[in-house]
Design a protein with these regions (language model features):
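Conserved active-site and SAM-binding loop architecture
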Residues: 1-218
Length: 218
């Protein structure tokens, strides 16, 4: 199979398909960090949405469409008003346009002529602005002791079957009372920039990557 991994600089999923003998290519505006530039297209993925591929698996940026993005869409003093009557957030006046552009990008990926399509994103605005996901999964369903709620919108590929259900992993608690999965808290402690934190949040666990490669390429 010829598989396009959209918005994947890490090449975790790309390499999982390559191990099974498939012609998989990652594509991202960033250079790859997975060690195989010969399998990486550093370019705008929308230039490659054509019938040369058998499947596209996309990991679009969630900055403007994750659940946490909702708080920045409107002025905090306008919560009592209907959404369409609320003013833009004073700190982020362009957030609504950013959200709309992000959703349009997802739709462009989903509606491509590629026969099989999978879109991965966290719980967020796609569910309300588009449609509910076909499946919600966790790393602990595929052998990785960690929690990271992940939604899948599928056109062609079947729902993934759990491969190895394990513990849900530890959590790190903070003085504020909030907590993060330990894998995420530990990784955040090592990062210095916003860009590094974004890459950490987009982490694909190996069990999930292997499940996609093994089950969707049959």
């Amino acid at each position: 199979m010829r598989i396009l991994l959209a918005c994947e600089e890490s090449q975790v999923v790309c390499k999982a398909f390559r191990k099974l003998g498939h012609k998989a290519y990652s594509c991202d505006l960033l250079p790859c960090s997975g060690g195989h530039p010969e399998w990486h297209i550093q370019d705008d993925v929308t230039l490659y949405l054509d019938s040369r591929w058998d499947m596209i698996i996309a990991f679009p940026p969630c900055t403007f469409i994750a659940g946490s993005a909702v708080q920045w869409l409107s002025h905090p003093e306008d919560k009592h008003l209907p959404f369409e009557d609320r003013r833009p957030h004073p700190k982020y006046p362009n957030r609504r346009q950013d959200m709309e552009d992000s959703i349009k990008f997802v739709m462009q990926l989903y509606n491509s002529p590629i026969p099989m399509v999978a879109i991965e994103n966290p719980v967020g605005l796609l569910s309300s602005q588009w449609r509910k996901p076909d499946q919600i999964i966790q790393p602990w369903m595929f052998g990785d002791e960690a929690t990271k709620t992940t939604c899948l919108w599928l056109k062609g590929p079947p729902n993934l079957e759990p491969t190895n259900i394990v513990g849900k992993g530890e959590r790190t608690f903070f003085k504020s009372g909030k907590s993060h999965p330990k894998w995420y808290a530990d990784a955040l402690a090592k990062t210095k920039t916003k860009a590094e934190r974004q890459l950490i949040r987009s982490k694909t666990f190996p069990g999930f990557a292997n499940a996609m490669a093994e089950q969707w390429s049959k």
